[in-house]
Amino acid sequence: NNAKLKYDDNWKEIGFELSPYLKFNTDINSNSIKKFISNLLPEGKGLEFVSEFFHISKANQFSLIEAIGNETAGAITFTSNKELSTNFREISNEELTQRIINRDKVNITVWDKKTRLSLAGVQDKLPLVVLGNDKYGIGEGKIASTHILKFEKNENIHLVLNEYFCMKLGKLCGLNTAEVEIKKFDTQNVLFVKRFDRKLLINEDGAFKVLKKHIIDGCQILD
């Protein structure tokens, strides 16, 4: 089936083109739209899990992106016209530790019977709100995550350390890499990656909001 994208006239005045191949005032190629969406979805086992969780075919990219599209990479939200409630669910250090230890038994991306897997790639990862001083939580609606947590694998126990080393080395070489930190939960090393497409603002009274910044990856740039 052919996919179509039409920008709202008001968006054309105040917004931006989503990618170099999704331009204003042109007939947008259907394949470019599908590729853009595809590169926002998880891959491998992550895609299989999301497909099974929502009972949606892996080939039905548009239904999948609607299901998990409240917080994809960048600033764009994919959703129906339903108004999403905004909530912040705090997670204690103890609860997070137990979920990390038992992630082989209970999928780390499922919290409160909802999947939080909304990022591209094949690695296990968890989007999380980090407010400092070991205060963690999961946001819904207008509250977006500030960090991405990545985990070790049984077959590759040095995965976290290797990615941390590469990110730090890249920064020393002058590359604008994301801020990373390794935190230990019981015996598990976890990589905290500060999202460069998010900005956390905290008021003096403790109220906070997370701003989103639009980004695209190399695949979306090259179509």
Predicted segments, located by residue:
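Phosphate/dinucleotide-binding and metal-coordinating scaffold of catalytic cores
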Residues: N1-D223
